[in-house]
Amino acid sequence: MKKTFYHYMMKHRAPLVKNEISDLAEAIYDDLSFPKQSEDYHEISSYLECSGLIESMSIFDKAWDLYLQER
C-alpha cells in the first residue's frame, strides 16, 4: 500500500534540526482540513496555494520530490 503525502510528511515532524520541510510538516499536521488521503500532486498543491500554509511552493516541490523517491 502506498503512503499518502500526509503520512510521508508526518515523519518530518519534530526533527532535531528544523528546516523548511519540517515546518511544512508541522503546518500540515495542525491543519484539520488538509487532504490527508490524497496522493495527487495537483490536489495538494492547489490546496496549499489557497490555504496560505506555505510561503513558497518550492518548499512543497522539494517535499514532493522526496515523497516520490520513497514511494
Curated annotation (Swiss-Prot):
Protein's organism: Bacillus cytotoxicus (strain DSM 22905 / CIP 110041 / 391-98 / NVH 391-98)
SS bond partners: none
The family this protein is said to belong to: Belongs to the UPF0346 family.
InterPro entries: UPF0346, YozE_SAM-like, YozE_SAM-like_sf
Lineage: Bacteria, Bacillati, Bacillota, Bacilli, Bacillales
One of the Pfam families matching this protein, by short name: YozE_SAM_like
Protein name, entry field: UPF0346 protein Bcer98_1690
Domain of life, per lineage: Bacteria
